[in-house]
Amino acid sequence: MFVTLIKPLARLHPRAWDFVQLVRLDRPIGIYLLLWPTLWSLWIAADGVPELKNLLIFVLGVILMRAAGCVINDFADRNFDGHVARTKARPLATGKISVREAWITFAVLVALSFGLVLLTNATTVWLSFGAVAVASLYPFMKRYTYYPQVVLGAAYSWGILMAFTAERGELPASAWLLFLANVLWTVAYDSYYAMTDREDDLKIGIKSTAILFGDADRLIIGSLQGLTLLLLALAGSRFELGLYFYLGLAVAAACFVWEAWSTRDRDPQACFRAFLHNHWAGLAIFLGTVADYALR
């Protein structure tokens, strides 16, 4: 549906689709995986009634910052992507978009995001600098550490902190439970993603948790998902959430079980489907959160 909505952009200019691909608007899974935990937190921070202004700011901010993250990622990987089957057609790798054009795109996206943050409060503005720093750092970590997914987890969890400060003007200690839960969840699902490229990454020297975990990959991913659910349950207790929130967690748990079963042979396509499937887990938790507040 999302891709259908943006298809008309290809007719605006002969090169428009190249930029759509650069910022991955044609692959919205990253938007969803960033959006759901941000919205969990926005709803919890606002006791179920977030300000419309903040809702719009965070939805647009998620789209813009995920796009910016894709640009800096492709810049960092431009000399590697051509050697990986899944990424060899990316616009920077093929030369359809120049490095200069990529940097201009990145700057515009960050500037627009910052303009949105300026509509919140000082604490959230200060936090936004950390968001840009972590998002920019992640792509380069793949050269130096087997834990780039942890950095990605921090980047994908930063919106949780900002949602609380935007709604409450402060950051309660319990918000860190949501932050840590999302970091662990991100490491889990991005490890599935890294499993699809593991053989290519080994050849070109790119590091990932999928390589680090080796034959224990599915066991460790399952353990991370279990810890994610435990931390979310603890957060639910701290924020006095009820039955529907925990039903959302139960659906997410079922999603995680399906992912473990479907990747039992470690087929790269199955691992990629498991990665995509996490969107449904995040959506289930969000719907459970919304229902819990709405039906009180």
Swiss-Prot record:
EC number: 2.5.1.39
Transmembrane segments: 29-49, 55-75, 102-122, 146-166, 169-189, 219-239, 241-261, 275-295
Record's keyword terms, sorted: Cell inner membrane, Cell membrane, Magnesium, Membrane, Transferase, Transmembrane, Transmembrane helix, Ubiquinone biosynthesis
GO cellular component: a single term: plasma membrane
Compartmental location: Cell inner membrane
Pathway annotation: Cofactor biosynthesis; ubiquinone biosynthesis
Gene Ontology BP, a term: ubiquinone biosynthetic process
Reactions that this protein is recorded to catalyse: all-trans-octaprenyl diphosphate + 4-hydroxybenzoate = 4-hydroxy-3-(all-trans-octaprenyl)benzoate + diphosphate
GO MF assignments: 4-hydroxybenzoate polyprenyltransferase activity
One Pfam family per UniProt: UbiA
Cofactor(s) the protein needs: Mg(2+)
Topology term for the membrane: Multi-pass membrane protein
Top-level taxon of the source organism: Bacteria
Disulphide bridges: none
Function: Catalyzes the prenylation of para-hydroxybenzoate (PHB) with an all-trans polyprenyl group. Mediates the second step in the final reaction sequence of ubiquinone-8 (UQ-8) biosynthesis, which is the condensation of the polyisoprenoid side chain with PHB, generating the first membrane-bound Q intermediate 3-octaprenyl-4-hydroxybenzoate.
Family recorded in the similarity comment: Belongs to the UbiA prenyltransferase family.
Family matches, as NCBIfam families: ubiA_proteo
Protein name per Swiss-Prot or TrEMBL: 4-hydroxybenzoate octaprenyltransferase
Species name: Pseudomonas aeruginosa (strain UCBPP-PA14)
